[in-house]
Amino acid sequence: WNMYEHKVLSYVNGKHVPVPVNITTVNELFDLKISNTSEMQSWLKENQVKGEINNSKDSALAKVGQELYELMFENYTIKQWDLNPSELEPSVLERIPVRDTFNDRYFSDKYEGLPSNGYTEFVKNILDHKNITVELNTEYNNSIHKSNKLFFTGKIDSYFADKFGKLEYRSLNFNYKTYDIEDYQPAAVVNYPSLEYPYTRKIDYKKFYNTTSKYSIIAEEFSSSIGEEYYPVPTKKNRDIYSKYQAEAKKLESNNIYFVGRLAEYKYFNMDQAILSALELFDKIYKK
């Protein structure tokens, strides 16, 4: 592991400011001189919009107030989901923390990092085992009879032939550009919340591994409803449909069929959460 610490910036009004929101974010955007936690907490309290939390807009307003919501979250969310935050469940913006310190790390875990040779090699090493056979371009239902247990990681609605209706997913498109410059942007990931930019963020991959080059290969990331399914869309309608599939999936556990992962559990997972979910399922099955 390379012990990389993830830091994200957002390009707002010509300035790069930290995400999650922290003291520096507020000072830069509003020309303030907040210097400690107490002052930051006071600023947040003055700006937060209190009320019932029914959706992601309510969630963001309760955390950061109207101005920061409009500057950093509203249009970014619209670009990412093609929905207004008021149409999304609270969980979308609820999971983004707000800091009352100068801490600019995206995550707060004690240990953080990426596999030294990347996730492709990481997965290759996992699969390189005498008891594992990989079959590509093969329909899962052709292999069910070969297994004592089936762990399904595809779309749960597809498994059940969409009998309760199709679930919605979002995909991504990437536009890669090469620049004759060593340091194109100040962080590995820079968000672009303004509708002035069609992409949601730009990524400089070499910063994940602290490598150097006289060139910068930048990925512009675009959210899309077309393409490989990456993100479940967290609306009440989708949640209600998923609950029906979830009940059906639970019944199949007695037949040793299990649903795991983003698409099968219709849930947003970070990488560490996805791995933990798989390990917990293993313990549930084999440590009874």
Give a label for each model feature.
Residues W1-N13, L68-E70:
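A short alpha-helix-loop-beta-strand transition element characteristic
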Residues M3-E5, V134-E139, G261:
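Short loop/edge segments at beta-strand edges and connector loops
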Residues K15, P20-K149, F160:
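Active-site/ligand-binding neighborhood in enzyme catalytic cores
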Residues V19, E220, V260:
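Hydrophobic residues at beta-strand termini and immediately following loops
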Residues E112-Y119, Y192, K267-A274:
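Aromatic-acidic/polar surface patches that form glycan- and anion
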Residues T138-E248, L252:
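Mid-domain catalytic core of redox enzymes
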Residues P232-K288:
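C-terminal catalytic lobe of FAD-dependent flavoproteins
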